[in-house]
Amino acid sequence: MSLRSEARVNTSTLQKIAADMSNLIENLDTRELHFEGEEVEYDASPGDPTAQEACIPFSSIYNTQGFKEPNIQIYLSGCPVKAQVLEVERFTSTSRMPSVNLYTIELTHGEFTWQVKRKFKHFQEFHRELLKYKAFIRIPIPTKRHTFRRQNVKEEPREMPSLPRSSENAIQEEQFFGRRKQLEDYLTKILKMPMYRNYHATTEFLDVSQLSFIHDLGPKGLEGMIMKRSGGHRIPGVNCCGHGRACYRWSKRWLIVKDSFLLYMKPDSGAIAFVLLVDKEFRIKVGKKETETKYGLRIDNLSRTLILKCNSYRHARWWGGAIEEFIQKHGTDFLKDHRFGSYAAVHENILAKWYVNAKGYFEDIANAMEGATEEIFITDWWLSPEIFLKRPVVEGNRWRLDCILKRKAQQGVRIFIMLYKEVELALGINSEYTKRTLMRLHPNIKVMRHPDHVSSSVYLWAHHEKLVIIDQSVAFVGGIDLAYGRWDDNEHRLTDVGSVKRVTSGQSLGSLTAASVESMESLSLKDKHQSHKNEPVLKSVNDTDMKLKGIGKSRKFSKFSLYRQLHRRNLHNSDSISSVDSASSYFNHYRSHQNLIHGIKPHLKLFRPSSESEQGLTRHSADTGSIRSVQTGVGELHGETRFWHGKDYCNFVFKDWVQLDKPFADFIDRYSTPRMPWHDIGSVVHGKAARDVARHFIQRWNFTKIMKPKYRSLSYPFLLPKSQATAHELRYQVPGAVHAKAQLLRSAADWSAGIKHHEESIHAAYTHVIENSKHYIYIENQFFISCADDKVVFNKVGNAIAQRILKAHREGQRYRVYIVIPLLPGFEGDISTGGGNALQAIMHFNYRTMCRGESSILEQLKPELGNKWINYISFCGLRTHAELEGNLVTELIYVHSKLLIADDNTVIIGSANINDRSMLGKRDSEMAVIVQDTETVPSVMDGKEYQAGRFAQGLRLECFRLVLGYLSDPSEDIQDPVSDKFFKEIWVSTAARNATIYDKVFRCLPNDEVHNLIQLRDFINKPILAKEDRLRAEEELRKIRGFLVQFPFYFLSEENLLPSVGTKEAIVPMEVWT
């Protein structure tokens, strides 16, 4: 026999002996052992027992282990566990069975205090387990777990304290105090000995686990081993409620009750197997009739019916009563019906901040992510991994979204992302690419997509929330996806060509700024003549490369490269920002100057022109990017960086996104097509409000994990909500936030969140705020589809607006309604030919809400107001203009906001559009926050002194200054949004003047002159002033102020804009458009 074979036999023999010894010890009848023993007092806590305890990090919830593992952390290090027997309950019986004493034991560990109830027989069973363990630990069994445990307790004393031997029936009433003291001393001594304190029998006796003493999970609640029945989940379209004995099984689980949720764990692996959130439908029932189980306990909420089995009816009653008492004490906010039917309570003293456009929003998200220590939650309708959150890009890829997430994941932060899983035939957002890209960055990044359309039968509705949550303490809520095309600032640039030039020693920065466009244009004309030949182009590049290295005369170099021609030629080969980023990126593509660019990045300096007018063509100097200057060994390189790279430069009405797996390749020609500016609103909340946002995300995540089999593995963990009790402990705070009252709102249903009753609290809040507004409302929204007829449209936002105006008219009150929406829906289509069918369908329902048909707002007003409705309500859009390649161009600014401001004291910001999809709750899932001011500033309203809210008024003034062109002119008085002077002489007048000028110079569409398709064809064939008379056009455009334009009510008013029969859009249910 070989040595290897002999070793194999010996190993096998040892394993057999170990198994036999283990069985022997397990079956040892320890009732024969004496309970008496030498009492030992020992405190094994390291260092001083009174030393400050160390908190168990919240992230440990993702690293739970089997309950019998020897190295799991349960207790706070350096902190003793103190026990006190408070009382004894004596249960008498009329039968011959002896009376039973029930001891109430209060335990304290750091900040945590809890009680357990035990009979004397439980003490005896516990003592036998420890004796068994004491004997077992002496046997050198060759297993990894046993060896580890032996090594850990090698130097520890093993003498156990004594347990009273006499039977409880033998002691008299007056001896109960002594028995209590004996049991208390016994526990105290056991808990001072780590060898026994950390043993799984001890933790089970004390009702503690790995999740008991985590600070952010709140106070320690009830825990214990139970039997639970499978099933009971409310999964749409699937009948698996667990009724009927044929379709369920019983499993042993460790139940944990916290202040706002219950969970149970698998004892063998320590994995969290389910989380049940406390909500307004939380109920506990006991008895066979309610549970279909002997000694059963039933726990209901909006998402599940959970059936537990106890040892006796009394045990079931105790569990039910104890859970209910604990939740009533610590989680009462979650049990109540809240305002507007919301799942979330109203919270006072919440730090909140608003954002107009994505620049500041993205920057604060980037900074908050950088400060994350435990978790990052993200959910979006669309997410583009390669977008830059800080622009211009002067630090390489540091602030690129995927790079931030990877960096934080490497630091140990857990990142959970939920994406809307689109119907690929209808949408091209390619969420599968996003998931694949993010998941391969790091194991700490987990991505789910939902819904599965076939299995869930959900084809028409979408997850539309846009949320970023940091450590469940800071939550960004609004309408801005972390996706292409969303980043914008108050400039709303139309062009983003980018350029880099060299400033010679005798040339000033100011002269270069003034002459940059002209010189670049003249150079581009020369370049075009040789763009079809490879050799001359490459030769000029090599020559330029030599000039950059200091070879040759500097006067021959006026521009980095012939970027434009090569840009068009090489778009399809571009797969990284280094290939198409800017003029300097061309050299990266041709391996000529990558080291130079990286070397000078730290020395970049940003400049802006010393004076910029908000009017006319003088704005175009800011349209191509921010100017930067770089000192190098060959002189100063000066130019304008790009803000939108690759797919981020977009105009989705002109062309929808394609090839998203090539993020840095342009898909439209930025030298001939202006981008579509993006106007949006976001917000951030802290503390308890952020906890509520996280709770919604957690509910959706856990529901998706249950619903989709691929996510049931341990690699996709259940998420746990942090306690509201610790919400005030902010580790990170977004600068610039103010204190206010806040409440979270949502649209959610069975398909989106797994809840029994749908929620439409956003709809309820909108109608309530409008109906109860006293002076004005200001609305920005991507859609305006309302005015219920209970046939096609059901939300009542439009009706509330009309009724509030009628009330103001009847009472002789001055009241204003400001509505800003996109001039065209955001669907691909050529408006010069009438637009696509989808675009026309949305136009139909927008016009139906505003002015066409008996249900429209204007038709509801005219019977009483006639034409006086114009004194109450204004409909506007946004538009801007610029110069692109020597040509005057204009484009609408796409309003994507979901904003309502009322009376300078109430704001609703979220992801919900004004349409049935967003408002009714049963359709798209949405999230919003209503903020009501508690801090005020002196102001004016309707000509009278008024205390305006800091949050609401600040946001309203920022929006007004932006759209009216007053950001750089604070002298204009826009404090009073109700006065005739502001409403008529500033707001209405500016919108009308701007619209008239744009129509005169560009003959813009949509246009009030075009009532049908025949007129449309004639309209687009007429010459436009911008091409016929450049000087006159420029003179007219100098009169433009801001971005505000009147909305054209009569565009295609004689056409039926609904999809015609035979088109694919006509097959789509009407609910898709509304």
UniProtKB/Swiss-Prot annotation:
Modified residues (Phosphoserine): S499, S561, S629
Processing after translation: Phosphorylated on serine and threonine residues. It is uncertain whether palmitoylation is on Cys-240 and/or Cys-241. Palmitoylation is required prior to phosphorylation.
Domain PLD phosphodiesterase: 459-486, 891-918
GO MF, any single term: phosphatidylinositol binding
Name this protein carries in UniProt: Phospholipase D1
Keyword tags: Cytoplasm, Endoplasmic reticulum, Endosome, Golgi apparatus, Hydrolase, Lipid degradation, Lipid metabolism, Lipoprotein, Membrane, Palmitate, Phosphoprotein, Repeat
Stated role: Function as phospholipase selective for phosphatidylcholine. Implicated as a critical step in numerous cellular pathways, including signal transduction, membrane trafficking, and the regulation of mitosis. May be involved in the regulation of perinuclear intravesicular membrane traffic.
GO cellular component: apical plasma membrane; cholinergic synapse; cytoplasmic vesicle; endocytic vesicle; endoplasmic reticulum membrane; endosome; Golgi apparatus; Golgi cisterna
Record region (Catalytic): 463-928
Membrane topology: Lipid-anchor
